[in-house]
């Protein structure tokens, strides 16, 4: 993609519709209710910094890799532009589950990533950019208390 095309993809896109806004809020709401709130007493300044940093870096990287490249290269192709990267993104979420399995189970976590990814894929395709789904993805990934504790060796 290169820096300019990546920056353009991350910042461009038509505004989301009301339905899209609702759908893009759901993953973050789920992460807040299932991960952030139940573990809020474990959060200190260092953990919050790791959570926020991980959320921004991971979400941006995943959006560029699994949506941006395919959106740029196959903008009108349903299979290569949307379905193939959705499968890749979903299976991509299986790898960390081998090291730190979700309490929900590996495959439920991967299925959840696929459902969230399908909403983001639709939004990216409709808007022509990653801005809308990136905000949702950052908010969702920044709720990862358990993952941040693991990164700090606090498991």
Name each model feature, range by range.
Residues 1, 21-37:
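Hydrophobic core of alpha-helical transmembrane segments in multi-pass integral membrane proteins
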């Amino acid at each position: 993609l290169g820096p300019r095309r990546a920056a353009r993809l991350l910042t461009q896109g038509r505004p989301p519709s009301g339905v899209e806004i609702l759908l893009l809020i759901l993953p973050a709401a789920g992460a807040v209710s299932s991960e952030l709130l139940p573990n809020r007493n474990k959060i200190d300044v260092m953990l919050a910094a790791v959570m926020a940093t991980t959320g921004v870096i991971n979400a941006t990287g995943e959006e560029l890799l699994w949506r941006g490249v395919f959106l740029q290269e196959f903008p009108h192709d349903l299979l290569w532009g949307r379905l193939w990267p959705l499968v890749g993104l979903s299976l991509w979420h299986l790898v960390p589950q081998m090291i730190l399995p979700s309490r929900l189970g590996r495959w439920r976590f991967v299925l959840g990533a696929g459902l969230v990814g399908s909403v983001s894929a639709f939004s990216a395709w409709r808007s022509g950019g990653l801005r809308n789904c990136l905000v949702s993805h950052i908010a969702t990934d920044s709720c990862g208390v358990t993952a941040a504790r693991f990164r700090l060796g606090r498991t």
